[in-house]
């Protein structure tokens, strides 16, 4: 999926709310990159909904509190911290972005 996300026309149209996140696995210690669909909340927050959370494990890396995460937004690699939120409306990872230098 990543190469498709880098094609400018597709990025602006079809994949407007898709990008990649990168984090280090809590147990494995391995760097993981995966495509996600996101929603921006202001300038400093991004929400990643987790569909069928009971069948996925990646979001659990953020369940015990803020953990470092990378995300590519508007062609810029950003860093921040992610926290998993589980509620009546489902599961999401809320990313608070670090300020730009």
What are these regions (language model features)?
Residues 5-8, 27, 36, 63:
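Solvent-exposed, flexible loop/coil residues
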Residues 1-18:
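Alpha-helical membrane-targeting segments
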């Amino acid at each position: 999926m990543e190469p498709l996300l880098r094609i400018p026309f597709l990025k602006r149209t079809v994949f407007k709310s898709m990008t990649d996140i990168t984090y280090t696995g809590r147990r494995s210690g391995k760097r993981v990159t995966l495509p996600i669909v996101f929603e921006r909340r202001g300038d400093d927050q991004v929400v990643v909904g987790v569909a069928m959370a009971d069948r996925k494990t990646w979001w659990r890396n953020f369940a015990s509190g803020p953990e470092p995460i990378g995300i590519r937004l508007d062609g810029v690699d950003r860093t921040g911290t992610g926290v998993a939120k589980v509620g009546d409306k489902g599961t999401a990872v809320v990313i608070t972005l670090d300020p730009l230098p």
